[in-house]
């Protein structure tokens, strides 16, 4: 689900796929999984639109660099939808991946929000570390030692600490974090909410990554409508 120029999500591809499936679907017990990142309320709207489909929202938590490993070693399964449908999917997940991986059954909106919480938290973490790196550079602090001391607090976690990042650049790019943080900010505006923390994280990213390389990923990260 790429973003529009204004930051809101564009579900044209997803909607067209469901339209085709709805037209071809002949069985009442088929379950369709949506794994695309969509703002809360989107899946419910699509379920109402395509009432002959049984839709479950099952967000993926894969990184582009280690997608296969992440798929095999999932930390949890989030299933949003009607309980009778999420139960069937959950049973399949347990059969395939074993019973040790938690399966969380919930409604559409909660499942959709969990995915955004995940991506936007890590995007904010990246921006925070970039700001700390700016301070370290200005005051001649040893960045490697600072990170070592910082991460020794087990609550911090070891991910998204590298500045520059794995791509050798500052901030975050790619086809996920930029579109997702913009989408959640745009969605919050529709709800008449102001999110200064997320907005600040996005502003920092625009400063440290002025090339805005995600805008080159047309169709994946952004849709430029005329």
Q: What are these model-predicted stretches?
A:
Residues 3, 114-115, 166-170:
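A short, mixed-charge helix-start or loop-turn motif at secondary-structure junctions
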Residues 137-226:
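NAD(P)-dependent Rossmann-like dehydrogenase/reductase catalytic/cofactor-binding core
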Residues 47-58, 63-159, 187-194, 204:
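Internal alpha-helical scaffold of NAD(P)-dependent oxidoreductase catalytic cores
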Residues 2-66:
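Rossmann-like NAD(P)(H) cofactor-binding subdomain of soluble oxidoreductases
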Residues 38-43, 121, 173-174:
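Short beta-strand to alpha-helix junction loop
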